[in-house]
A protein has these predicted regions:
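A conserved helix-loop-beta module that forms one wall/lid of the active-site cleft
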Residues: 407-468
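Active-site beta-loop-alpha junctions enriched in small/polar residues
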Residues: 347, 410, 498, 696, ...
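Catalytic alpha/beta core domains of metabolic enzymes, predominantly
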Residues: 728-818
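Conserved N-proximal alpha/beta basic substrate-recognition cap immediately N-terminal to
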Residues: 357, 367-431
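Hydrophobic faces of well-ordered beta-strands that scaffold small-molecule active sites
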Residues: 33, 404, 455-457, 493, ...
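Non-cysteine beta-strand/loop elements that form the S-adenosyl-L-methionine
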Residues: 518-522, 527-530, 712-721, 744, ...
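ATP-dependent carboxylate activation and anion-phosphoryl transfer catalytic cores
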Residues: 1-223, 228-234, 241-242, 266, ...
Length: 818
């Protein structure tokens, strides 16, 4: 926005038609009208109308400063547009958009989280988040959007291996729209493709392709002097066109710091322009540009604190962290600080102009954050509430003289360094699974051979289990290491012994550096190996012994105090054979902070703000006044998954997070709380149907015990071994066989012969990979995507077994059973 390639005549015509439609439908409030325009025939076709605020409403509000939802509420309450004041226009009915900047929305995808899915864009939405950027020109805004995505890219060139491909290969890859389309077009232009060729294939407007071609030509001219800093005029032009310091450093192969120092020496620094907010005065909402004079007055009335937001929503980092940032801003205001928010996500509350005293709609990169810090000179920056994004910046910010409030960046590094962390656990006499760090295949194989398979492997400094896998043998470990990207001595692969039959749990804590308070221990419902963000969890725990709960809280306090954590902290644990093991420490706000705050009735973020600002306010730590309390109800968190958008993907869960949201069910009865959570996910709950249970030999009797305990007659397809016959004989009258199968192929035959309308495949096995392979075979042969749920292990079956294997037509009673 604004429209750059649509004539004013067409824009006016579509606007007038939209007004007629809205008047005819008699919409009061926000409305979204979508059009298609054929530039060849000049024909307009209406696609759809949404008589409500929509996803684009939030984007439009942030792009224009026009508070659509607020105005919609006023109109719904009976006001008219002529009643609502609107700044220089007088009243809202006279408002005309007149922005003198360019706004770009760029979607964030997560295809890497869904193995086997084709990166293909179409009529069904597949983005999991988005960023918005603002610039004085299209080029400036577009390049700013790329570095806002936080995909490790700071410009359009040299993405993946695209620069090694020929022009013909790139043009072929462009035939199918994908999330990489812009990066492919950039490299195709570099390899000699013409604007006309790209237009013929992609149908992208020629003007946009010409803008991209100019960026390619400018980059090639810069690369001609690789190894040296660019000439003054070339650097000035590059910055005006949106080239980031980091990207210039990469393509020129010179240190980013040298680029920055030369730029500052030239007086080439970001200026700040306001986004005018309709109907309000003095709302401080700014964007950066190298193409205008600075119009950002600085106040000195109050001490300032800068909060770094979470960037774009994606799997592993979502609105849970925005919750923390918003509550941090509100708490800081109450303490008398001027709050400065930095974020680039239009979907969030943190980027509302009235959440903080001053909003910078900017990428969360070192260059952009340092520019804001230099401009505002705050007393400190808070990096612990925005997830992994600001944490990854914290160390570099500190090196550049930025005061980080709360937990020190060195503590963050300590938590990620498995060797140092293990030394600390040994000192505290806290058990931890055997582990190690590797930067190559040989090191990884040696570590795995020492600690034994299966092992859990993951990159360091990631969120959401990105790249995390359970590996069962040397062959697959070798494949994993060979495929790993960005592995360095500073960013090694972490390898831990996988606790195969463990019950996983976690605890959030508030710490002042010397004392810590743990409000709750959360019990994970899924088995070990499922990422904590994907697992349902319950507060308070149902099956962790009181002794182990005390142990977990004590371990958490000892670790927080030893590390000197100031603020929030999350600890992950596993319990195997009644022994508590530490899995990892996260000295920051976690995605469970909103959950614990709501279920336990504790204001975790404001309490953390009291602690991290104590050196500035002189206020005493609140930890001593916090007391544990009994919770007379249950809260169950359940994850929400996007498998409806990725129907070719097997929905089996694992150590890499794939959920995009979560819900909370609460009740005095734990079974009812769980059921509420399932309903809240909007996943269709089958009221009848057949359950096909596939388990390994050692678990078969246990599965039947679950069914028998619930008094549920079950029909099974069993193997023809002696164990199956013994089970059938032992539970005669309770278990009936629909067929005796010799192989996985025969299981498919049973499904086909019985013509099940609703199949739930319940798998519980210590060999997760075997289960996955069997399920894939069933799905392939039946042509259906089957839903997988883990049958709950051991003592946990009493809590939720009935949801998966029971007659869910029966109303839940007070004890949470049928």
């Amino acid at each position: 926005a604004p429209m750059l390639t649509i004539s004013e005549e067409v824009q006016k015509r579509l606007q007038e038609k939209s007004y007629k439609i809205v008047d005819s439908v008699q919409v009061i409030g926000g409305c979204n009208v979508q059009w298609a325009h054929d530039p060849k025939t000049d024909r307009d076709i209406i696609i759809e109308i949404n008589p409500r605020t929509s996803r684009s409403s939030a984007l439009a509000s942030k792009a224009t400063g026009f508070p659509i939802a607020l105005v919609s509420a006023m109109l719904a309450a009976g006001l008219t547009l002529a009643d609502i004041p609107c700044g220089k226009y007088g009243t809202l009915d006279k408002y005309v958009p007149d922005a003198d900047y360019v706004v770009i929305k760029f979607a964030r995808w997560a295809f890497e989280k869904f193995k086997g899915v084709e990166d293909k864009l179409g009529t069904q939405m597949r983005a999991v988040g988005e960023v918005m950027s603002i610039g004085k020109t299209y080029k400036e805004a577009f390049q700013k959007a790329i570095r806002s995505l936080e995909t490790g890219r700071y410009g359009l060139g040299h993405a993946k291996d695209f620069d090694t491909k020929s022009k013909e290969e790139l043009l072929k890859m462009l035939i199918t729209p994908s999330s990489e389309r812009h990066f492919l077009m950039y490299e195709a232009l570099r390899k000699g493709a013409t604007v006309e060729e790209l237009h013929d294939i992609t149908k992208v407007k020629v003007w946009f392709l010409e803008q991209m071609k100019e960026l390619v030509d400018e980059e090639e001219a810069l690369i001609a002097n690789k190894g040296a800093l660019p000439a003054d005029d070339a650097l000035i032009a590059a910055k005006k066109n949106g080239f980031a310091d980091k990207y210039l450093s990469q393509i020129l192969e010179v240190p980013e710091q040298d680029i920055r120092e030369k730029r500052i020496a030239l007086g080439l620094e970001e200026a700040w322009e306001p986004v005018h907010v309709s109907g309000t005065q003095d709302k401080a909402y700014y964007y950066s540009t190298y193409n205008a004079e600075d119009k950002n007055p600085i106040s000195e009335d109050k001490p300032k604190v800068m909060i770094l937001g979470g960037g774009p929503n994606r799997i592993g980092q979502g609105i849970e962290f925005d919750y923390c940032c918003v509550h941090a801003a509100l708490a800081l205001k109450q303490l008398g600080f001027e709050t400065i928010m930095v974020n680039c996500n239009p979907e969030t509350v943190s980027t509302d102009y009235d959440t903080s005293d001053k909003l910078y709609f900017e990428p969360l990169t070192l260059e952009d954050v340092l520019s804001i810090y230099k401009k505002e000179n705050p007393v400190g920056v808070i990096a612990q509430f925005g997830g992994q994004t600001p944490l990854n910046l914290a160390a570099d910010l500190e090196k550049n003289g930025v005061k980080i409030l709360g937990t020190a960046p060195a503590v963050i590094d300590l938590a990620e360094d498995r060797d140092l962390f293990r030394e600390m656990m040994d000192k505290l006499e806290i058990p931890m699974p055997e582990s190690g760090m590797a930067v190559n295949v040989d090191e990884a194989l040696a570590i795995a051979d020492k600690i034994g398979y299966p092992v859990m492997v993951r990159p360091s400094y990631v969120l959401g289990g990105r790249g995390m896998e359970v590996v069962y043998d040397p062959e697959n470990l070798t494949k994993y290491m060979n495929a790993a990207v960005g592995v360095t001595p500073d960013r090694p692969i972490l390898i831990d012994r996988f606790l195969n039959h463990a019950l996983e749990c976690e605890a959030d804590a508030i710490s002042d550096g010397t004392h810590a308070f743990v409000p709750a221990v959360m019990e994970h419902i899924e088995l070990a190996g499922v990422h904590s963000g994907d697992s349902a969890c319950i507060i308070p725990s149902r099956h962790i012994s009181e002794e182990n709960v005390k142990t977990i809280k004590e371990y958490t306090r000892k670790i927080a105090e030893e590390m000197g954590v100031k603020g929030l902290m999350n600890m992950q644990y596993a319990i195997e054979n009644d022994k508590v093991y530490v899995l990892e420490a996260n000295p920051r706000a976690s995605r469970t902070v909103p959950l614990v705050s709501k279920v336990c009735g504790i204001r975790m973020v404001p309490l953390a703000i009291d602690i991290v600002t104590a050196e500035l306010t002189g206020r005493k730590s609140p930890i001593a006044d916090l007391k544990e309390k009994d919770i007379p109800y249950y809260g169950v968190k359940e994850a929400v998954f996007p498998f409806n958008m990725f129907q070719e993907v097997d929905p089996v869960l694992g150590p890499e997070m794939r959920s995009t949201g979560e819900v909370l069910g609460m009740s005095r009865y734990y079974g009812e709380a769980f059921f509420k959570a399932q309903e809240a996910t909007k996943t269709e709950l089958p009221l009848s149907g057949t359950v096909l249970i596939s388990v390994c030999d050692k678990d078969k009797e246990e599965v039947v015990e679950v069914a028998k305990e619930r008094n549920i007659p079950i029909r099974v397809g069993v193997n023809s071994g002696s164990l199956e016959k013994e089970i059938l004989a032992k539970y005669d009258g309770h278990v009936t066989a629909d067929g005796i199968v010799e192989s996985a192929m025969d299981k498919v035959r049973i499904i086909e012969e019985l013509n099940y309308d609703n199949i739930v495949v319940s798998i519980k096995s210590s060999d997760v990979m075997m289960c996955v392979k069997a399920h894939e075979l069933l799905a392939d042969k039946t042509g259906r995507l089957l839903h997988i749920h883990d049958l709950l292990h051991g003592h946990r079956k009493h809590l939720f077994g009935h949801i998966y294997a029971g007659n869910i037509q029966s109303p839940l009673s007070k004890n949470g059973r049928h």
